[in-house]
């Protein structure tokens, strides 16, 4: 049994034995570049995370995919572990090989509370991943209304010119559409790169509920595709 495997398997008592014995490299990486801390964060083993951090585990070491322990914690969604990593100086806006920050990972996993916590801690909401998507785009796509409300969607669009409103309409997120409409009306008649307005997309999708919301908000019913 290696120290790294004990951390990965959640064997707290064995981890304690290794640490008490001493001479352990708490930051030793495996072939994938993952550290004991990375695995403990990924699996949600908060007690082991605490032991490792108290033993000077490095919160900034990234694996071969440029994922840090905070990325791993974002995948497991454990808010307590995320808070602990932040307390020990984890980089909030580190990006993995896909350009995703821990915040984006949290939103993609629909972890609203933990995402709001990272935003409160100062996570950059304007970082775009390699696909051009920002935090607001993920929050919109997954219907995370609390996050949508706290983020500014002004002037935000993806690589195809789709605004958060386009995305909410495309995904049939009627409550998110309602939230975005109360936040700003600047996106209401904005076309994407294909010339499609949110209303056109709603009609193409046959979503009468969303179409009515847009029309009631003042969407231009005469705007046509170019």
Where are the regions that the model predicts?
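Ankyrin repeat A-helix N-terminal signature
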Residues: 5-10, 39-45, 72-78, 105-111, ...
């Amino acid at each position: 049994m290696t120290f790294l495997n004990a951390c990965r398997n959640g064997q707290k008592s064995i981890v304690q034995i290794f640490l008490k014995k001493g001479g352990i490299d708490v930051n030793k990486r495996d072939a994938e570049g993952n550290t004991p801390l990375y695995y403990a964060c990924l699996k949600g083993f908060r007690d082991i995370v605490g032991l490792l951090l108290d033993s000077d585990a490095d919160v900034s070491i990234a694996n071969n995919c440029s994922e840090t322990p905070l990325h791993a914690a974002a995948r497991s969604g454990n808010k307590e572990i995320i808070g602990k990593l932040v307390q020990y100086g984890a980089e909030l806006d580190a990006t993995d090989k896909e350009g995703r920050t821990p915040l984006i990972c949290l939103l993609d996993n629909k972890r609203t509370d933990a995402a709001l916590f990272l935003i409160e801690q100062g996570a950059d909401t304007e970082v775009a991943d390699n696909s051009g998507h920002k935090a607001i785009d993920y929050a919109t796509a997954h219907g995370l209304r609390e996050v949508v409300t706290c983020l500014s969607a002004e002037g935000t669009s993806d690589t195809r010119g789709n605004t958060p409103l386009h995305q909410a309409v495309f995904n049939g997120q009627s409550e998110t559409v309602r939230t975005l409409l109360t936040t700003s009306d600047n996106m209401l008649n904005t076309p994407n790169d294909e010339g499609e307005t949110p209303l056109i997309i709603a009609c193409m999708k046959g979503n009468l509920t969303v179409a009515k919301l847009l029309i009631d908000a003042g969407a231009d019913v005469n705007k046509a595709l170019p």
